[in-house]
UniProtKB/Swiss-Prot annotation:
Gene name as annotated: gpmA
Origin: domain of life: Bacteria
Purpose: Catalyzes the interconversion of 2-phosphoglycerate and 3-phosphoglycerate.
Any one GO biological process: gluconeogenesis
Amino-acid positions noted as binding substrate in the UniProt annotation, renumbered to this chain: 8-15, 21-22, 60, 87-90, 98, 114-115, 183-184
Membership in a protein family: Belongs to the phosphoglycerate mutase family. BPG-dependent PGAM subfamily.
Keyword Isomerase (UniProt): yes
Pfam families in alphabetical order: His_Phos_1
Reaction(s) the record says it catalyses: (2R)-2-phosphoglycerate = (2R)-3-phosphoglycerate
Official protein name in the record: 2,3-bisphosphoglycerate-dependent phosphoglycerate mutase
NCBIfam families: pgm_1 (TIGR01258), PRK14115.1 (NF010713), PRK14117.1 (NF010715)
Active-site feature positions: 9, 87
Marked site: Transition state stabilizer: 182
Pathway the protein acts in: Carbohydrate degradation; glycolysis; pyruvate from D-glyceraldehyde 3-phosphate: step 3/5
Amino acid sequence: MVKLVFARHGESEWNKANLFTGWADVDLSEKGTQQAIDAGKLIKEAGIKFDQAYTSVLKRAIKTTNLALEASDQLWVPVEKSWRLNERHYGGLTGKNKAEAAEQFGDEQVHIWRRSYDVLPPNMDRDDEHSAHTDRRYASLDDSVIPDAENLKVTLERALPFWEDKIAPALKDGKNVFVGAHGNSIRALVKHIKGLSDDEIMDVEIPNFPPLVFEFDEKLNVVSEYYLGK
């Protein structure tokens, strides 16, 4: 059986401050750095050997991937970065305190923006300091592809081609794969892998730690699913 390990990035500075992060390139907190190292230790203890790793183009996921691979003595494993594994784009909510947003827009509205499958938050202004339209890491993309806001549905739509073109073929080739990504990009892929309904995915949470493991048969049917260390 092949294994796919999802590691959500460790706690970021904005997680710690309770801010909507999305595509903002925020660093790991001290706690988050340790979580990434501990994730690697759990991987080593479990004896999981990787052949390929994938991550987003955001530093909190990149650092988590590198720290986890280093702690599991697998820093040599090839790592491919893709914007398609980025966190969901929180649009105009980016940088806002979650509690303050609830006060401004109402608890129910913010809950809908955060947890619904297909409701978009307000768009981010193109001149916002966190806008991806002027970010060099997305310079190769057509401007029409770069989002101003995303819901989970849109997040899955842009992550799914990466699953179909990269992750799934690697697994079918018998490779164990590490994916260092984000809460919502992982949720989106979990929805696809498990065939969850739009309502079912609303209750799925992906913690910063520990890593989530899927084991597949040769046809990519899920054989088992578990969190390391639990």
